[in-house]
């Protein structure tokens, strides 16, 4: 169990003036001196809790909480359409269903060419990723589940849309026109370009058509501003600088109920500071006025001959869109991952931001960025970007990935590291605390019981009622948890 130093107060908390700039869930933040810490109240201490599915302890949670796991792919899981459920459960969102149930639309981050899962016509007959949709009770009992998108690749995160759909993101730029990615597996057999976003209606089927004008890059997550009808997008370009983007549809999706493919993609730049290095450590409460630079060619197709290895390398292709923005002054970030919109603010995570500047543009073998996490907030109406948090100490925060907001404005962060993985809460008062600890053990290892403590959490999302937190274990043998209990009592 981690020490009290893990429950540190926010180092980059806003001052009173900064809070007024930000508003929203973090308007209550107050400045804390560097190094200030605070022990979480005793009722937040984590303890082993048995899974309602079978009595096994898979999570440590605060007192009074329960959970049920489902769709555990250590064993074969058949969906209602006959599909064998793939693993790599990743980003996810929850929507209202009938009879008090919840629709989950869940990503499966499967890479490399191969046969798609599920029925119907896939986007790419050699794409193994996609989404599944699950109707589930608030306490984690599955009513039905089916394939809702197939034939994609590396479906990482995404974001919920207020009209009732999920935008799923491909974290790759693979295709027949691009050389092999980090796995070394040839892309020659792929039939479509990848690196796009797709829309999936809750409880329904995706039309399997990519929204290409929203960019072909290593997409991670999206967050939608219903006031202006603008979609904000994060990029997780592992070995190179990443960008923060916005996509402005030609028609307001709040009126049409869907994203169109005729919009404009733009990249964030800092006013007066071309190519601002926001991946490196920033001053406390750093605040920037931003502008947006256009991406002229958001969905490139590179020259290739079918059936032959493409001359364009993966490293060349994966920076193509971002380089257009950086040529016009776009800002450098480190590995932008989860994003969430709340009350006029887009919150997003930089997984390796906050450390010393990188010595080169890349590729960087252990990832671009030398910190262990930054949390940024972008005020959409004021076009102001503010740093909420940064650290180089994994005992404070260790590589934040997916993020969601609770009904009370607390951020729930999924850690993605090679050691113990936690869900962390970040309150409006600026307190960072442990919310859940992975204590999963394999049931199929030899002998059984091998620890899987470094399997990451992903896809945290609250039910529409706010009573249940659904979250995934992202691993080749994935699963989903429904966690419920006295959230208000612990300030989540």
Identify the function of each model-found stretch.
Residues 12-492:
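Conserved small-residue
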Residues 1-17:
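N-terminal secretory signal peptides and thylakoid transit peptides that target proteins
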